[in-house]
Amino acid sequence: MNDNNNEIDQLIYLFSKLPGLGSRSARRIVLYLLQDKDVRLKTLINNLTEIDKKIVKCQVCGNMDTENICGICTSEYRDKSVIAIVETVAELWAMERSGNFKGLYHVLGHNLSAASRQNPSILRLPELLDRCFKENIKEVIIATNSTLEGQTTAYFITEYLKDHPAKISRLASGIPIGGELDYLDEGTLSAAINLRQPFE
């Protein structure tokens, strides 16, 4: 690109920062949008504008929805005695795609890194403990990733919840060490949910 296309370069740069996209893929996407600007680009702009106006974080679990309390939290068909703890909304959506988990969720928003010595206060654990007592939770499924950070976070959560009587379990087989839930296929994730084990 040359200096006369600063806006295009900036758009390519922004797309290249999205997960899974490099500069070459970003360039192809921008070119695709610009080749039919009146339809493709304007449709994308309109959709992004609507999302910006309407999407909010669920005040209970941390999911993304159009309502302050999301459809999962308000559903009468969910098992409200079981709660899965996930690191981000991406993992929540992955578990929903599996179609195998019918309980509630709690999104931490972060994980803990032993190397960087992060403050555990970045996790939404006081809200989690409050929910466990108020909602009479019987089982807490720790569904953090199988990375070192995910394991560190899982152990910290277990210690934090030790005074609550709920059974604490962890997703089981099928998740490789270092694996992230969002990248697993639905079948593997379903097996991990069904074969979850007590956390020790």
Curated annotation (Swiss-Prot):
- GO BP of this protein: DNA recombination; DNA repair
Q: Which SUPFAM superfamilies match?
A: Recombination protein RecR
Report the Gene3D superfamilies cross-referenced here. 3.40.1360.10, 6.10.250.240, RecR Domain 1 (1.10.8.420)
**Which residue stretches are annotated zinc finger (C4-type)?**
58-73
InterPro entries membership? DNA_Rcmb_RecR, Rcmb_RecR, Rcmb_RecR_Znf, TOPRIM_dom, TOPRIM_RecR
> In this record, what's one Pfam family?
RecR_ZnF
This protein's UniProt keywords: DNA damage, DNA recombination, DNA repair, Metal-binding, Zinc, Zinc-finger
> Which terms does the record give in the GO molecular function aspect?
DNA binding; zinc ion binding
Q: Show where the Toprim domain sits.
A: 81-176
Return the HAMAP family for the record: RecR (MF_00017)
This molecule's function is given as: May play a role in DNA repair. It seems to be involved in an RecBC-independent recombinational process of DNA repair. It may act with RecF and RecO.
**Protein family:** Belongs to the RecR family.
Name of the protein described by the UniProt record: Recombination protein RecR
